[in-house]
Structures are given as structure tokens and as C-alpha cells.
């Protein structure tokens, strides 16, 4: 089973769309977009995604991609 990376549509509009597009090219990830992930406070402050239900944050799309892969490696999800 591949790691699931979940994005909130509101956070995508705030800049994490670029990270989502990069991650969607990885066949070893399941990337999903939802209308809301119920992290509104976090969503307004920073870019984030949930990786297998755990929040990963960053200040820009490139850092978000890097942090997601780091989280996956550290937790041996692939």
C-alpha cells in the first residue's frame, strides 16, 4: 500500500497546488484532494498536507515536497 498524501482545496489555492502536481507524478504515492480537511487554523497559516493522517508543513511548495518525502523516509512508508 502506498502512502496517502491528502491536500485541502483551500490550501491548494494558497500555494500548495505546485507541490500536489509534483507529488502526483510519483507512482508510489496516492495523492488525494478534499474540499476540507478540518485544519482551518493551520490552513490559513502555512502550506500543509496530511501523509497517512499526519500533518506535514512547509513555507513554500518545494519545501513541502521535501518535507513530505523526508517524513515518508523517516517513517519507512515506502
Curated annotation (Swiss-Prot):
Alphabetized InterPro entries for the sequence: DUF1450 (IPR009910), UPF0349 (IPR022916)
Superkingdom in the source lineage: Bacteria
Family assignment from sequence similarity: Belongs to the UPF0349 family.
Record protein name field: UPF0349 protein BLi03401/BL03152
UniProt source species: Bacillus licheniformis (strain ATCC 14580 / DSM 13 / JCM 2505 / CCUG 7422 / NBRC 12200 / NCIMB 9375 / NCTC 10341 / NRRL NRS-1264 / Gibson 46)
Taxonomic classification: Bacteria, Bacillati, Bacillota, Bacilli, Bacillales
Amino acid at each position: 500500500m502506498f502512502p496517502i498524501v491528502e491536500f485541502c482545496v483551500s490550501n491548494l489555492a494558497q500555494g500548495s497546488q505546485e507541490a500536489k502536481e509534483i507529488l502526483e507524478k510519483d507512482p508510489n504515492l496516492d495523492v488525494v484532494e478534499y474540499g476540507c480537511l478540518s485544519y482551518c487554523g493551520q490552513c490559513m497559516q502555512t502550506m500543509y498536507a496530511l501523509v497517512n493522517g499526519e500533518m506535514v508543513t512547509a513555507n513554500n511548495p518545494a519545501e513541502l515536497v521535501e518535507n513530505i518525502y523526508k517524513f515518508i523516509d523517516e517513517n519507512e512508508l515506502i
